[in-house]
Amino acid sequence: MAKHKINVPFFEIGPKSYLYGDDVLNLALAADKASEKYGVDVIFTCPVVEIRRVAEATKHIHVFAPHMDPIPVGRGTADTLAEALVAAGAEGTQLNHVEKPLDFDTLAATIARAKEVGLMTMVCADSMAEASKITALKPTCVVAEPSELIGTGISVGPEYVAAAFECVKSVDPDVLVLTAAGISNGQDVYNTIIAGADATGSSSGGAKAADRAAMVDEMIAAVRKAWDERHN
């Protein structure tokens, strides 16, 4: 079982390989500040080599790895070991991103390995059928995002958000639903949350912004605003 918990609403920031070194840390610090300011949980999907530094420098964000392998302790040159992620300070891992896809059997084994060491799992799905199948594996969160929209600046519409939420919750109401792809600014974030998602997230929208800290603040503020409007 996972040792940690994500509260809704939440927001995911994944700098991928757009940033490295101090730029990753500074983005994480901005996310940490905004998380506390707005009372919104933030998953920071961190390059593996920066996990320890980011985890030690922040207090409010949930530091995730971008990938993990299902190997046990032992052989596995260049693989990412679950126990090593925990030791570095990670609370969870992303899996099955379109840029790092896994076949279903490997994905199931990797989710199981993550659970063994208490890591949360945020698993990407490219279709409703895949989302349904992944939900049955009981990850922490399913990320429903059409791969053709990733990095385009074109976000999903409210119909997709509602369908993804229903798809996941009909299989397991305890699995969280993050709907993303093409999230570029606070308005995109607001539109996604107000349409019914537990969460949304951004990679290039934050990492490539002219003022990254300001964009992170804008996006996380939009999560809070939309969620409060939905529930008041």
Identify what each model region corresponds to.
Residues 1-80, 121, 131-138:
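Conserved N-terminal beta1-alpha1 strand-loop-helix module at the mouth
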Residues 16, 47, 85, 145, ...:
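Conserved, mostly hydrophobic/aromatic
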Residues 59-114:
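Glycine/small-residue-rich loop that forms an oxyanion/phosphate-binding "nest" at active or ligand-binding sites
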Residues 66-77, 104-105, 123-128, 176-187:
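Glycine-rich beta-to-alpha transition loops that act as phosphate-gripper elements at the mouths
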Residues 71-72, 78, 139-166, 175, ...:
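Glycine/Thr-rich beta-alpha phosphate-binding loop at enzyme active sites
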Residues 80, 125-138, 182-200:
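Catalytic cores of alpha/beta
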Residues 91-102, 141-154, 195-216:
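Glycine-rich phosphate-binding active-site loops on the catalytic face of alpha/beta enzymes
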Residues 110-116, 156-159, 205-232:
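C-terminal helical cap(s) of enzyme catalytic domains, especially alpha/beta-barrels
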